[in-house]
Amino acid sequence: MSKTAAQPRVGLYPGTFDPVTNGHLDIIRRACTLVDRLVIGVAINADKKPLFSLEERREMLEAECAKLSVGGEIVVRPFDTLLMSFAQEVGAGIIVRGLRAVSDFEYEFQMVGMNQKLDPGIETVFLMADPTCQAIASRLVKEIARLKGDVSHFVPAAVEGRLKAKFGVS
């Protein structure tokens, strides 16, 4: 597909981002090389009981994305609908997903099958996690922070500060 000014390539990177990690930012940076506009969909998922509010997660993402040197546009938007409905709403032709391990692939493979039934015109693109980010998972970062461990290798400094504030760590 060729780039045209009339039809920019729009990608959607959905997730909970509770909190945003260096792994997420690596995928965002690399996804921006594939599309003209990347929409980061911050999922409202009550089942996950996030540590950070939707507004806090959106703020962290916007602040960290503003620091990235990318050529395309990045937009952060919350969503609480079906992923494919949201993708259609934002005009995304590509859904971007990061893969860290085989277990990620098994889950994502099932999701692609379902999503293709809902809208076969939207492709899913998988980006392998950078080797330096393969072990990073938001839930593990939160657990390490809760136990007063060092998360500086896994999240940006501002996010580390917010984690420390949440868990009362100085």
Task: Specify the residue positions occupied by each region the protein language model found.
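Nucleotidyltransferase catalytic core that binds NTPs
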Residues: 1-170
